[in-house]
């Protein structure tokens, strides 16, 4: 069923369609002037959106992955091209990632991902897909679509190859989501089914029009929708209430190929801050959390590692330990002398 995402409304659809057809700077300037470069109301309930450029990426990708001033880092086989950033080429055993260097402290947000997956492989002879991340750790290569296993945060997976044999319940490519507190492993053999929050079929390979994915996190409500039919309409995919994500994590995207391969391209990542009205009761309920979790879904507990001691703290510990040690020796000597003196008196 076609739908408009939450309070996105017609403004974002109109703007995105124009940007997709013409990526020129002049058009972007006209759009900004037309909107007054200010916040846009995107629906009822006094919800406004603000584009956060420090967490966004679009053409011409100037400075991406180069120098300490870049907001985005490349990893592995990822390459900056003129029209896209290629995470992995259509070659075997490749791995690449793109990570934002700035931690995100937004309370409510929306990430729009413009991507393309294509290659020479025929049916079920391509892989493996890509992932979009909001995690505590960044730039950590691993087996989960090019990222580390047992991650802490949110992972959204566009899985293009079914690993599980006798798979009849779902059609691939398939989008799924997972929240992890660092205790869970992604089950490749079962395509992540034991730990997924939900999912949907998404036919996204070798399409001749733009494909989009949106991840929306508002009032601890996670919504994932897609625009993959060339109709500029959002379709429901995943909706999960009670998702608790800490602030200060990093956005990124990654991909991996094995014996099978595909081109995995990212055209743009656009993060919007959403300002949402909350009642006093909601303010109390929506306090910051320190580990990701999902209501009504028990995750194995993990013991948070103790933070490393600073130099000053270590000095204080050593100093006071020495003071206590010397004090104990002095007290021991005094008690020993008194004991010897009493022993001599008894002897005489």
Swiss-Prot record:
The chain crosses the membrane at residues 314-334. Residues 1-38 form the signal peptide. Residues 39-313 are lumenal. It is found in: Endoplasmic reticulum membrane; Golgi apparatus membrane. One of its GO terms (cellular component) is COPII-coated ER to Golgi transport vesicle. A carbohydrate binds at residues 93, 128, 161-163, 188, 258-260. Residues 335-348 are cytoplasmic. It comes from the Eukaryota. Glycans are attached at residue 181. GO terms for molecular function: D-mannose binding; metal ion binding. SUPFAM superfamilies: Concanavalin A-like lectins/glucanases. It is a single-pass type I membrane protein. Pfam families: Lectin_leg-like (PF03388). Gene3D superfamilies: 2.60.120.200. Disulfide bonds join 200-237. A motif (Endoplasmic reticulum retention signal) lies at residues 344-346. Coiled coil: none annotated. May be involved in the regulation of export from the endoplasmic reticulum of a subset of glycoproteins. May function as a regulator of ERGIC-53. This is VIP36-like protein.
């Amino acid at each position: 069923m076609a739908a408009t995402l939450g309070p996105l409304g017609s403004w974002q659809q109109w703007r995105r369609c124009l940007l997709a057809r013409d990526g020129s700077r002049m058009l972007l300037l006209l759009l900004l002037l037309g909107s007054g470069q200010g916040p846009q109301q995107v629906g009822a309930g006094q919800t406004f959106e603000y584009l956060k450029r420090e967490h966004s990426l679009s053409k011409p990708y100037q400075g991406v992955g180069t120098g300490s001033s870049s907001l985005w880092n490349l990893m592995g086989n990822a390459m900056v091209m003129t029209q896209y950033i290629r995470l992995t080429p259509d070659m075997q055993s490749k791995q690449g990632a793109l990570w934002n260097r700035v931690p995100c402290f937004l309370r409510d947000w929306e990430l729009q991902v413009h991507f393309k997956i294509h290659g020479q492989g025929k049916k079920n002879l391509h892989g493996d897909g890509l992932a979009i991340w909001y995690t505590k750790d960044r730039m950590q290569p691993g087996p989960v679509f090019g990222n580390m296993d047992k991650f802490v945060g949110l992972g959204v997976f566009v899985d293009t190859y079914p690993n599980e044999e006798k798979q009849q319940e779902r059609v691939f490519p398939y989008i799924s989501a997972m929240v992890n507190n660092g205790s869970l492993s992604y089950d490749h053999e079962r395509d992540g089914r034991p730990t997924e929050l939900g999912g949907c079929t998404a036919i996204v390979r070798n399409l001749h029009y733009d494909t989009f994915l949106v991840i929306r996190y508002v009032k601890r409500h996670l919504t994932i929708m897609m625009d993959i039919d060339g109709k500029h309409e959002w379709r429901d995919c995943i909706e999960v209430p009670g998702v608790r994500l800490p602030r200060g994590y990093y956005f990124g995207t990654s991909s991996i190929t094995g014996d099978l391969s595909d081109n995995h391209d990212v055209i743009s990542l656009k993060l919007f801050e959403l300002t949402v009205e909350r009642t006093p009761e909601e303010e109390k309920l929506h306090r910051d959390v320190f580990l990701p979790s999902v209501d009504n879904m028990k995750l194995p507990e993990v013991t948070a590692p103790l933070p490393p001691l600073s130099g000053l703290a270590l000095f204080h510990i050593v100093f006071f330990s020495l003071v206590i040690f010397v004090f104990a020796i002095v007290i021991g000597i005094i008690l020993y002398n008194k004991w010897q003196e009493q022993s001599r008196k008894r002897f005489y």
